């Protein structure tokens, strides 16, 4: 229980199987992910084919340094650690996957700045064709990961 990184793959498999079961039962559900893997792409496509409405809420941090600092703070409070190299890799991959893969396949999406005590909506939309950008500077930082 004190080494979550050793069971993360197994936990991910369990979660994917649970999501598949919920879809087959036509249940309403939500799940949390860092978007660092493409494992959810096919599941989202299957869910959409079964008339699910896919809504994405993305909570963005404005720097990898802030992500590292928050993890350090969590560890000091007794929470689990994530190695720095993993955090750095995930930060970039998450943003790349957000703008290149997940925004285009979700019915609706909202991106929030979670860098301060007060969370702010940066942008929201229905795919990329109908979007409302509320903070152009932050949106440009995020959208810079588009390939």
Task: Annotate each language-model stretch with its function.
Residues 1-27:
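Conserved substrate/cofactor phosphate-moiety recognition/catalytic segment
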Residues 8-12, 37, 91:
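A conditional alpha-helix N-cap/helix-loop micro-motif detector
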Residues 26, 50-55, 105-108:
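Short glycine-/polar-rich loops that comprise or flank the Walker A/P-loop
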Residues 31-40, 61:
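Acidic, metal-coordinating catalytic cores used for nucleic-acid/nucleotide bond scission
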Residues 42-46:
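A short acidic, amphipathic alpha-helical/loop segment
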Residues 52-101:
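A glycine- and Lys/Arg-enriched "phosphate-lid" helix/loop adjacent to the NTP-binding pocket
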Residues 100-147:
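NTP-dependent small-molecule kinase module
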């Amino acid at each position: 229980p004190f080494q979550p990184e050793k069971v993360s793959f197994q936990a991910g498999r369990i979660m994917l199987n649970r999501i598949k079961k919920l879809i087959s039962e036509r249940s309403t559900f939500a799940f949390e992910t860092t978007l660092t893997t493409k494992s959810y792409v096919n599941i989202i496509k299957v869910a959409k084919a079964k008339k699910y409405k896919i809504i994405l809420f993305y909570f963005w941090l404005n720097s990898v340094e802030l992500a590292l600092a928050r993890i350090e703070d969590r560890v000091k409070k007794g929470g689990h650690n994530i190695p720095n190299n993993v955090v750095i890799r995930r930060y970039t991959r998450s943003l790349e996957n957000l703008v290149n893969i997940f925004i285009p396949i979700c019915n609706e999406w909202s991106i929030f700045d979670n860098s301060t005590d007060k969370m702010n909506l940066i942008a929201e939309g229905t795919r990329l064709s109908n979007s409302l950008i509320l903070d152009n500077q932050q949106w440009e930082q995020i959208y810079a990961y588009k390939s």
